[in-house]
Amino acid sequence: MPFQAVLSALLSALTLCVGKFPIYTIPDKLGPWSPIDIHHLSCPNNIVVEDEGCTTLTVFSYMELKVGYITTIKVNGFTCTGVVTEAETYTNFVGYVTTTFKRKHFRPSPSACRDAYSWKTAGDPRYEESLHNPYPDSHWLRTVTTTKESVLIISPSVADMDAYDKTLYSKIFLNGKCSGVSQVSPFCSTNHDYTIWMPENPNPGVSCDIFTTSKGKKATKDGKLCGFVDERGLYKSLKGACKLKLCGISGMRLMDGSWVSIQNHDEAKWCSPDQLVNIHDFHSDEVEHLIAEELVKKREECLDALESIMTTKSISFRRLSHLRKLVPGFGKAYTIINKTLMEADAHYKSIREWTDVIPSKGCLMAGGRCYPHHNGVFFNGIILSPDGHVLIPEMQSAMLQQHIELLESSVIPLMHPLADPSTIFKKDDGAEDFVEVHLPDVQKQISGIDLGLPEWKRYFLIGVSALAFLALMIFIAACCRRVKRKKRAKPNPVELIRKVSVTSQSGRPIPSWESYKVETGGQS
């Protein structure tokens, strides 16, 4: 990509062009003019910035974006939901057993989720066993509650990572995003109170595989870093660069929108939120290749124009336009004054809008002012038309304009439009439909005697039973008393015979037979 350095130089203006790309170069310092011979004409070197004076080169390694890097960085993960399964068993008076299963939630710990995920991915039977219902137990006239805690793993669950701050985005995250996963906080909260999200790899930074390591040479002047020569041998300036972290790695965003992992440029400030990094894809590489061919063609056109000037010993404004320097820095400017070829030292700057060059009709902004013309002639082929308009004979090629439009459109969005806050899970106490789980560590709780009735019915039955029992006791006591009384009133058969009373002849009752005999014997 030989044009990458040219584009970098084009964008290394003395004034910061935030998020914009230059379309032309104009001298900000110009003069004085002096006559020259046509043999002093030369085509400018547009490959490097000549005014930085960075001559000390030191070999170093750096990282840059991979070719083919796309905006969306996918991070594979899984959701982990904690579920408590209760097996409630009641055995009634006749031994009939009733078992009821209930499921509730709990918030699982990250370590338990990581272990369960490892079991599931490794095919360990412990994971499937942990999902089984607890084995119920029973006791006569008692309610036995057996609980089992489980964690349900659902995978894959893919999130999108923002390369700028490593923020994760997904519809299931709380508020649609997660500030990132680290050793301190190894999970992300979700819209479900009892579900957490964790990356498949404990170190999610490995998902940010967008960099490649390259070797180059640092260019310094008096110990101060002012640029570097990349792996392709192209010089890139750090003028106008700003500091920017990608996937947690510190680096510099150059003015052409590219990014390199250079960190020791002390004068640079942090990039503003709208200064994004250009996508380095195959399309832009293809366009850059075509632009490089276009620049070679421009160089050949300049040499052809120069050869034509030398051969014909004549010059025109159009031919002078080929000699303009296309990148910021020191160069030459040429004009024709009173039919004399003139040359001046110039320092070129890049401009991003044509209004920066022609702010009003008839005004060519150069050197910080409306530059005066000589009989309708400015310099570098720029002239004044008869109706008073400034005419610039050349602009950047259509191919370069296409590349500029591509760079302006191919930027990484600061936030990914994937968060959908309308998706919320239920938050009731029962387990949702997506949960089918129940886990280890069985706990048994045996209640007291329970007839399986509601509380008021139970107290009512106890009261009725107490009254019935009291009535039964009273009835039994009454029966016993009556039986005892009957036994006491009934005489002995022998005594009954002895106690039979008779009536004497005199009419008086005789209590016994013996008395009767005595009485009758005396009378005789």
Curated annotation (Swiss-Prot):
Its main location: virion. It is found in: Virion membrane. Changing K148Q: In strain: Isolate Holland/G9018/1987. A lipid is attached at C480 (S-palmitoyl cysteine). One of its GO terms (cellular component) is viral envelope. Residues 503-524 are annotated as: Disordered. Residues 481-524 are intravirion. Residues 20-459 are virion surface. The chain crosses the membrane at residues 460-480. Glycosylated and palmitoylated by host. Glycosylation is crucial for glycoprotein export at the cell surface. It holds the Pfam family Rhabdo_glycop_FD. The keyword Signal applies. It is a single-pass type I membrane protein. Belongs to the lyssavirus glycoprotein family. Arg-352 is highly involved in rabies virus pathogenicity. Its mutation dramatically attenuates the virus. Attaches the virus to host cellular receptor, inducing endocytosis of the virion. In the endosome, the acidic pH induces conformational changes in the glycoprotein trimer, which trigger fusion between virus and cell membrane. This is Glycoprotein. It comes from European bat lyssavirus 2 (strain Human/Scotland/RV1333/2002). The lineage of its organism: Viruses, Riboviria, Orthornavirae, Negarnaviricota, Haploviricotina.
